[in-house]
Amino acid sequence: MLTRKQMELLDFIKTRMDRDGVPPSFDEMKDALDLRSKSGIHRLITALEERGFIRRLAHRARAIEIVKLPEAMERAGFSARAAKAAAAPLPKGAVTVETAGALDLPLMGRIAAGLPIEAINGGPQSVTVPGMMLSGRGQHYALEVKGDSMIAAGINDGDIVVIREQQTADNGDIVVALVADHEATLKRYRRRGGMIALEPANDSYETQVYPEQMVKVQGRLVGLIRSY
């Protein structure tokens, strides 16, 4: 049986992975559970791993994988959310493939996880993604990541990110941002008064700050695919 804090942490990790496609950082876990230090999170993570609910993968940032959920959490709505997502209408442009629960999404090109590069150019390729990875009823597309500025968020060079098309974002969302109408980048979004900060997840890079009118949100990260 899990303690209340262990349940809260597992719930938070699952919710953030459903939303962003990557686990939350230890700082985000600490804030979500209102703990004073990350050592408490380390203890909770270790307890969840020892009980077989999660698995930590070595030598990777934010490398947490959910192995199973307690029955109480399944009854509380995780299974219901899965059923609802599976029954939702297909996103515009998506094509059903033979693999159960999978969809083909257009692979629109490469996106910088580094300094901004030229705006995304679409191509004829597509990528197959789990249907459960798609959030809501909006249009989705995929991009190949170029660069290492988001590695602390678990996003590596060569990964495929799944993006839900939208023009707005909340603080902390990982977004595709179009800068000055011609440069695209994948960064964490922060609003600072009349300015927009695009934050990397790698200390080797600096946060980019632009006037609000120079930044257009093109979509939000909802999933990630990695080939080994």
From Swiss-Prot:
Its EC number is 3.4.21.88. One of its GO terms (molecular function) is transcription cis-regulatory region binding. The record marks A113, G114 as: Cleavage. Keywords: Autocatalytic cleavage, DNA damage, DNA repair, DNA replication, DNA-binding, Hydrolase, Repressor, SOS response, Transcription, Transcription regulation. It catalyses: Hydrolysis of Ala-|-Gly bond in repressor LexA. The keyword Hydrolase applies. Homodimer. Belongs to the peptidase S24 family. HAMAP family: LexA. This is LexA repressor. The lineage of its organism: Bacteria, Pseudomonadati, Pseudomonadota, Alphaproteobacteria, Rhodobacterales.
